[in-house]
Amino acid sequence: MLSILKKLFGTANDRTVKKLFSEITKINSLEPAIQKLSDEELKNKTVEFKEKLKNGATLDDIVYEAFAVVREAAKRVCGMRHFDVQLIGGLILHRGMITEMRTGEGKTLVATLPAYLNALTGKGVHVVTVNDYLARRDSASMGKIYNFLGLSVGCIVGGMPDEVKRAAYNADITHATNNELGFDYLRDNMKYSLQERVLRPFNFAIIDEVDSILIDEARTPLVISGPVNDNAELYGKIDKIVRLLNASDFEKDEKLKTINLTETGITHIESLLSKESIIKPDTSLYDFENLTLVHYVNQALRAHNMFTVNVDYLVREGKVMIIDEFTGRVMEGRRYSEGLHQALEAKENVKIQNENQTLASITFQNYFRNYPKLSGMTGTAMTEAPELKDIYNLDVVAVPTHNKVTRLDLDDEIYGSKKEKYDAILKLIRDCYDRGQPILVGTISIEKSEELSSVLNKEKIPHKVLNAKFHEQEAFIIAQAGRFKAVTIATNMAGRGTDIMLGGNPEMLIEQLDKAHNYEAKVAEIKAQIAEEKKQVIEAGGLFVIGTERHESRRIDNQLRGRSGRQGDPGKTKFFLSLDDDLMRIFASDRISGVLRTLGLKDGEAIHHPMISRSLEKAQQKVEGHNYEMRKNLLRFDDVMNDQRKIIYEQRTEIIKSKDSHGFLNSTTEELAQKIVLTFMPVGSYREDWDIENLSVELHRVFSIKFDHNVVSKNDVTEEEITKTVIQMAHDIYKSKEEAYSSELMHNAVKYILLTTLDQVWKDHLYSLDHLRQGISLRAYGQKDPLSEYKREAFNLFEQMLNNLKELFIQTVYHFHIDLKNVQKEDVSLEYKKLQKNMRESREDPAFSKYNAGSSIETDLKPVVSRIDPKDRNPDDPTSWGRVSRNELCPCGSGKKYKYCHGANE
């Protein structure tokens, strides 16, 4: 019934596109008049549009004329005229939606339309790409159009100094990678003045390859971190022990990607740990004193049994480097968290780096939701449309192709074993190679690509391998994959964003030429050669794309298919599968094996059957659904931290903007003074119950006040009067500092101390949240909702953090001291500037431009010791307690508050 209705009325997508086509006529009707304009008149249109916006017009009032202007500018500057379908794509992007356009349909050119229009407001537009190469390429090629029309263009790539970045972000249109944008946002919120920040307020972003960034990378948070402790030796010891375990000692679930020790495994590993003197004899791995070891053992088990070298990671130059499962690219600078990376380093016998503590983090989900207006483009988004709508409130519209797709997608071939599958793939590659038809072979891992490469080497078939190991050559190799007799093996979607042109890409070959020797003649020769090869390739059938396995996501399979048949070119695609493939083995083996038995599969034979294709699609949908729920669950938890992050970042900005820091200082001084007095002199208590001794100690610790016991000797003195006296004494101490150091220095110092203290307690808080997240799922066993428990406890931790902030801030301000012996009074304000400069330089350490920023946060203030989860504290070992709040019960088990027990002398 539904299919009949769709045929009668069309889908919602069809109706949207039809409506957009009617709008395109308005743009086309303006073209004759725009064509008559001189270059100068065309450029002046930008000034005219800005004036209209200033006088109250909206972007929608000028959208058709602005698009017509960009189309004409592109034609004059680049020799490219936007097709009608590209104009539709531009309207979709301008309206804050995602446009799905096939490979080769010119998405890069499409982005110029909404980018130009929205940049007219002067608030900036970010065009987001997945790597530095594409950011540079697109800003250089499309920047010519923007510059012609009088707009400025910036490009952001890794490793740029702040002043260069700031200028690029202040441009009308900025091309940047998603990673750099996210990290610059985090780094900006660790800066100490607004002038040091590089980003402007969020306005409008256009994300290229939007599915890759908002879906594939959604589960990977951006983290700036620093090392916390050195347990390298312990990781090494545990690794050696885990290698001695038997297969019966643990159980693993490949679907859920979990691994656990069995009862026999626990007994076995306990004996091994005891033998190595890591645990005491006759104690259990799960005894309180040994609980921290469980984490090390679990991560070592995962490293050895759930992670494979050259599939999940590779080892390069003595470092373990993560491979992106969707693109096959190395994720430069990223490290697995929670000790997993250290476990992998121990497994591969390379230098074990310190574990890291989070200093700042954000997911792409929450970063991109900061933009008031967001849009994106990709060749494959319809399969993920529900998720994009649910999480980002982005609708997806599929735009028809300019030329009819002539590519032929052949049925899958299923074989009984991997060897039979490879034999069939080799036969097809040989046939295509002999007739000159270019072939692109897609694999799901480096290991598989190198395995296939070795087979082709034995058969003496020339080929190129494109995977994470050759990232630098990625764009060039993929661009030439359409040449006559070319055979290219690519890991997943490596080279995405670069078109495969039949016959080859002449521009990239020309870039390699030496301009000093016969340059023009060589250019002409290359163009003639490419034109000839294009004819030969078209006669041979175009690009043949071979998939060696189905991916977990249908979208990734569609991306691979989409490399062939660009702009109406001929081409073919075909997937070869076997029962040994991961997807078949883990998710669809039982169902498909039954079908194959019914059909009677023989050795070397391939099966083509719609029932198998449907079973595979169901398996993929099941995995996609599972991954979607994981991303959604991550977002639910991350939203808790995101709400807190927004509060902290907003407060930080307010502090930086503040011209008077005394307001917070005075209110906090009064609040803490009252709190301390009432702690030792409770309301309604008898005078003999007042603890004047400890009141004096506490006032000196917090305010540096030397409290005179005679103040309370009067018979009629009240708690309120003593509180007022304490507050006045604190104000007097601060006033004396102003007289000694100058009001300007103290104002700046208070602001600086407040910022550094906020950073310290926030870092500490993130560490506590990390610990909370790691164990919160276990609450489900107690019939409690982990998310509700996480929200409740995270709120409590946040309140505790704010209390710690106040106490540490006040304590530091009132103990703040500059040695004036060798400093003239008129130069004292320079001391603060020097202090501030040192802080800024430590934060701008080159390590901070890396994903894993290293320990570059240092101040002249006493560092705050990290908070430790209470269950990880050893009552007999104060060094294991971390920082303990003064009003907490002492971890030693005495039942006293910490400040009256082990913390009495602090």
From Swiss-Prot:
Q: Which domain of life is it from?
A: Bacteria
Q: What's a GO biological-process term for it?
A: protein import
Give residues annotated as binding Zn(2+): 890, 892, 901-902
Cell compartment(s), UniProt: Cell inner membrane; Cytoplasm
Keywords associated with the record: ATP-binding, Cell inner membrane, Cell membrane, Cytoplasm, Membrane, Metal-binding, Nucleotide-binding, Protein transport, Translocase, Translocation, Transport, Zinc
Name the residues that bind ATP: 86, 104-108, 499
Q: How does it sit in the membrane?
A: Peripheral membrane protein
**EC number(s) from the headed UniProt entry:** 7.4.2.8
Name the cofactor(s). Answer: Zn(2+)
**Cofactor: binding comment:** May bind 1 zinc ion per subunit.
Q: Which reaction does it catalyse?
A: ATP + H2O + cellular proteinSide 1 = ADP + phosphate + cellular proteinSide 2
Q: Molecular function terms in GO for this entry?
A: ATP binding; metal ion binding; protein-exporting ATPase activity
GO cellular component, as recorded: cell envelope Sec protein transport complex; cytosol; plasma membrane
Spell out the InterPro entries in the cross-references: Helicase_ATP-bd (IPR014001), P-loop_NTPase (IPR027417), SEC_C_motif (IPR004027), SecA (IPR000185), SecA_CS (IPR020937), SecA_DEAD (IPR011115), SecA_motor_DEAD (IPR014018), SecA_preprotein_X-link_dom (IPR011130)
Q: How does it assemble?
A: Monomer and homodimer. Part of the essential Sec protein translocation apparatus which comprises SecA, SecYEG and auxiliary proteins SecDF-YajC and YidC.
Its function, per the record, reads: Part of the Sec protein translocase complex. Interacts with the SecYEG preprotein conducting channel. Has a central role in coupling the hydrolysis of ATP to the transfer of proteins into and across the cell membrane, serving both as a receptor for the preprotein-SecB complex and as an ATP-driven molecular motor driving the stepwise translocation of polypeptide chains across the membrane.
Its family?
Answer: Belongs to the SecA family.
The record's section on PANTHER family has: CHLOROPLAST PROTEIN-TRANSPORTING ATPASE, SECA INNER MEMBRANE COMPONENT OF SEC PROTEIN SECRETION SYSTEM
Name of this protein: Protein translocase subunit SecA
